[in-house]
């Protein structure tokens, strides 16, 4: 794939899809009480205002897939790249933007684990989409 515009649109689109699937996983986890069952107070309402920025940021994080590392093992690549948004969520968004403490611990002691799992969903979905699209 030599077309740079196609590369950019593929990784952005894959990241957006990952963001959508991640968001649905977070929402379903809250709706079905899974988050509450593990003591994590994350149960968002599914709305365009909540969903749209998550999809866009998923697309932006998708640009990590332009990096030429771990392409042979796409699932590992997705998991490794999911650490980027995970670290930002735990050390920037929760403490500085949402006022939920470092790593979101005000939301429950297992919040960091939940964030790792939900962002792994993003990374794996984006990686699978790129594999299916024959990007790699």
For the regions a language model picked out, list residue spans one by one.
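Juxtamembrane/disordered regions of integral membrane proteins
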Residues: 1-136
């Amino acid at each position: 794939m030599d077309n740079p515009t196609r590369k950019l649109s593929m990784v952005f689109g894959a990241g957006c899809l990952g963001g959508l699937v991640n968001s649905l996983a977070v929402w379903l986890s809250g709706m079905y009480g899974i988050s509450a069952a593990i003591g994590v107070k994350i149960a968002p309402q599914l709305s365009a205002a909540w969903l749209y920025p998550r999809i866009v940021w998923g697309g932006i994080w998708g640009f990590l897939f332009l990096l030429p590392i771990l392409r042979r093992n796409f699932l590992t690549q997705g998991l490794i790249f999911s650490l980027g948004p995970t670290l930002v969520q735990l050390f920037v968004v929760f403490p500085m933007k949402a006022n939920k403490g470092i790593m979101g611990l005000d939301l429950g002691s297992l919040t960091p684990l939940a964030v790792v799992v939900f962002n792994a969903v993003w990374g794996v979905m984006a990686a699978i989409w790129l594999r299916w699209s024959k990007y790699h």
